[in-house]
């Protein structure tokens, strides 16, 4: 049997099998030794290089992302620096107690009541959706009242066109500010009461530098809110960008603006910051060289025949001004639908003939629909036009 398999005896076969097993074992040992050598080389390379070669790509990615991160950090630093400048021009004092606030708020309600009864001069009261303004001492043209838009176009009304500052403002508000050395004696000659309903706002602006001295002093009543700096407004629907600084204003607190906060950056009241009724009394001093509307310089040929009698009765309506806004009360639900504010009132001057796809849902301005209705009464051609399919109605 051993000869048939090619081996002379059994010992030769056993010897050949042993040598084959030794070869296989040697191959395995050699492979293990080679792997150990590779591992040792890798360890030596790692000791020489702090980061593995595979980290090169990651490091390159980090280097590539550094400029982007740097731009973001630079933007944040600029924003923080601007906020610091704004804060440097702000002074806040918690000055009025709860009882004092209640007394002043009752007086503000009296002002609102007198205005509803028509007891003030025409230019004393200015109404807008969810916000009414009451000018005392000095009033000025602004926003949609201007023939030309833009900073520097504001003008003071002629003397006597707005009512005098009420005695209670002097006694309950101004005198206390003087006693605490917030303002000097005799500083204030202009007082404005802004009365906001929930959702009301005032767009970003700078108090006219050519009209008012600094500082600008305001006192808050009825509820807490916030004064925001550096916001941008967009409309239809209204949207407001993030502010550079949002300053909490508490009921009974006094806010004094000067320097950068008053002159170099806009401030506003956002709709989302008026959750309850809020009123603010703004106290300022007009500049001696502030421009003023001069009704006397207008040619008599441009004035209506009744101008002289109106002037004597105190009912002045300067033809240089645009018609006043509606004196209707704002709808309480107006805060929950798109509103047309002062900066986009130009839409109201377009054609009263609306196409079908622009029905009432596209506009919420009370004046727009009322003017459209009245125009249809004045213009029979428009009323009978086949293109006019929208039925106008008062609301």
From Swiss-Prot:
Q: Which GO terms describe its molecular function?
A: 2-oxoglutarate-dependent dioxygenase activity; metal ion binding; molecular condensate scaffold activity; mRNA N6-methyladenosine dioxygenase activity
Record's keyword annotation contains Oxidoreductase? yes
Which InterPro entries would you find in this protein's record? AlkB-like (IPR027450), AlkB-like_sf (IPR037151), ALKBH5 (IPR032860)
Q: Where is this cross-link: Glycyl lysine isopeptide (Lys-Gly) (interchain with G-Cter in SUMO1)?
A: 87, 322
Enzyme class name: oxidoreductase
The annotated consequence of gene deletion is: Mice are viable, anatomically normal and reach adulthood but display impaired fertility resulting from apoptosis that affects meiotic metaphase-stage spermatocytes. Testes are significantly smaller and histological analysis of testis sections reveal aberrant tubular architecture and size. The number of spermatozoa released from cauda epididymes is dramatically reduced, and the spermatozoa are morphologically abnormal with greatly compromised motility.
Q: List, alphabetically, the Gene3D superfamilies matched.
A: Alpha-ketoglutarate-dependent dioxygenase AlkB-like (2.60.120.590)
Residue positions of the active site: 140
Q: Which cofactor does it need?
A: Fe(2+)
The text the record gives for the protein's domains is:
The C-terminal disordered region undergoes liquid-liquid phase separation (LLPS) for the formation of paraspeckle membraneless compartment.
Q: Tell me the protein's name.
A: RNA demethylase ALKBH5
């Amino acid at each position: 049997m051993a000869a048939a398999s090619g081996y002379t005896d059994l010992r030769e076969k056993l010897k050949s099998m042993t040598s084959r097993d030794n070869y296989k074992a040697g191959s395995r040992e050699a492979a293990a030794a080679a792997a150990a050598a590779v591992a040792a080389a890798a360890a030596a390379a790692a000791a020489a290089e702090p980061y593995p070669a595979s980290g090169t790509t990651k490091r390159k990615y980090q280097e590539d992302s550094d400029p982007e991160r740097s731009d973001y950090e630079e933007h944040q630093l600029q924003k923080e620096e601007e906020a610091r400048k704004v804060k440097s021009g702000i002074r806040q004092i918690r000055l009025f107690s709860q009882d004092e606030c209640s007394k002043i708020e009752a007086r503000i309600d009296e002002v609102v009541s007198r205005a509803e009864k028509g007891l003030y001069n025409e230019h004393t009261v200015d109404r807008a959706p969810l916000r009414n303004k009451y000018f005392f001492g000095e009033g000025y043209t602004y926003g949609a009242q201007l023939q030309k838009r833009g900073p520097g176009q504001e003008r003071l009304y002629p003397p006597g066109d707005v009512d005098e500052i009420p005695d209670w403002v002097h006694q309950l508000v101004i005198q206390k500010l003087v006693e605490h050395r917030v303002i000097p004696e005799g500083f204030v000659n202009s007082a404005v009461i802004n009365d906001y309903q929930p959702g009301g706002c005032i767009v970003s602006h700078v108090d006219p530098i050519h009209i008012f001295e600094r500082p600008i002093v305001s006192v808050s009543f009825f509820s807490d809110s916030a004064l925001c700096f550096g916001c941008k407004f967009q409309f239809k629907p209204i949207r407001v960008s993030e502010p550079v600084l949002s300053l909490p204003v508490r009921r009974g607190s006094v806010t004094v603006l000067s320097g950068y906060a008053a002159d170099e950056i806009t401030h506003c009241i956002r709709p989302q910051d008026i959750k309850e009724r809020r009123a603010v009394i703004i106290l300022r001093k007009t500049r001696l060289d502030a421009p003023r509307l001069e009704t006397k310089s207008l040619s008599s040929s441009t004035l209506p025949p009744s101008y002289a009698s109106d002037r004597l009765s105190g009912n002045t309506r300067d033809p240089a001004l645009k018609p006043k806004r509606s004196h209707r009360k704002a709808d309480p639900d107006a805060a929950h639908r798109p509103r047309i504010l002062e900066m986009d009132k130009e839409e109201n001057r377009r054609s009263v003939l609306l196409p079908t796809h622009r029905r009432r849902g596209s506009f919420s301005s009370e004046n727009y629909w009322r003017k459209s209705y009245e125009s249809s009464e004045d213009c029979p051609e428009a009323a009978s036009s086949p293109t006019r399919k929208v039925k106008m109605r008062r609301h």
